[in-house]
């Protein structure tokens, strides 16, 4: 009788814990966990990934700018660059928790 009581309590505990982990529950996903989650959510359609590349070799093709031109150019795009940085998937899902629904925004 005690075994059935323990088994019943364990079953109730499993049901309650599985209900609380629904797909909409936000989670922190970083590194390989984030990539695995994207593969799982996006499936065969894949997901958008744009790795950063080194732009130093490309800068040699441009004429040098004066200090004043550089300052004006940096100021003009500062807000836009800040917005892009804040909306990245790492900011959205690693630094803060995100849900499966938010991950779907990065699918192709």
UniProtKB/Swiss-Prot annotation:
Pfam families: Insulin. One of its GO terms (cellular component) is extracellular space. Disulfide bonds join 30-94, 42-107, 93-98. Gene3D superfamilies: Insulin-like (1.10.100.10). It is found in: Secreted. Keywords: Carbohydrate metabolism, Cleavage on pair of basic residues, Disulfide bond, Glucose metabolism, Hormone, Secreted, Signal. GO terms for molecular function: hormone activity. Residues 1-21 form the signal peptide. It comes from the Eukaryota. Its main location: secreted. PANTHER family: INSULIN (PTHR11454:SF9), INSULIN/INSULIN GROWTH FACTOR (PTHR11454). Heterodimer of a B chain and an A chain linked by two disulfide bonds. Insulin decreases blood glucose concentration. It increases cell permeability to monosaccharides, amino acids and fatty acids. It accelerates glycolysis, the pentose phosphate cycle, and glycogen synthesis in liver. Belongs to the insulin family. This is Insulin. It comes from Danio rerio.
């Amino acid at each position: 009788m005690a075994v059935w009581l323990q088994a019943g309590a364990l079953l109730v505990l499993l049901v309650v814990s599985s209900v609380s982990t629904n797909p909409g529950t936000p989670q922190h996903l970083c590194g390989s966990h984030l990539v695995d989650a994207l593969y799982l959510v996006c499936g065969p359609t894949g997901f958008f990934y744009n790795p950063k590349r080194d732009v130093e070799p490309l800068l040699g093709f441009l004429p040098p700018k004066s200090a004043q031109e550089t300052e004006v150019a940096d100021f003009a795009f500062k807000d836009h660059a800040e917005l892009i940085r804040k909306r990245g998937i790492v900011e959205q899902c690693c630094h803060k928790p995100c849900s499966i629904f938010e991950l779907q925004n990065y699918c192709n």
